[in-house]
């Protein structure tokens, strides 16, 4: 989805389903026997000014979210959520390299998260303003791909800071 030419753009839409049983807090069963089901449509787009500078936008729409919680008297309380999630905007700044048999890029990405709806009892998305920084490095050869990245977010509110990381490997079967 990342066009590398000046004036290039792209978009994608994808659907995500999340089903959870025995709601967890870390690895501990916080609410055994309770479940959560979430259906999300993700809208994502990119525009490239120059191959090194682009803007990305990610906007999720929660089609339906339902979570079972204890009601305090031995029963189940069902919480529901739907609607727009938080708009994420990023400005990936890339440095490309081409070496003998290997090419890739390093990325520095400032980000902002903008809440589009009000907080309620069950918020699948944060619904708090946030800023973040992302860093990444990836390279590929004729047969292999390697990527590593991390992002750090801080929020304006009660939500604690977060760090997300990924490590990706790939093989070209052609």
Show the residue positions of the predicted features:
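Transmembrane beta-barrel domains of Gram-negative outer membranes and organellar outer membranes
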Residues: 1-121, 127-148, 152-155, 164, ...
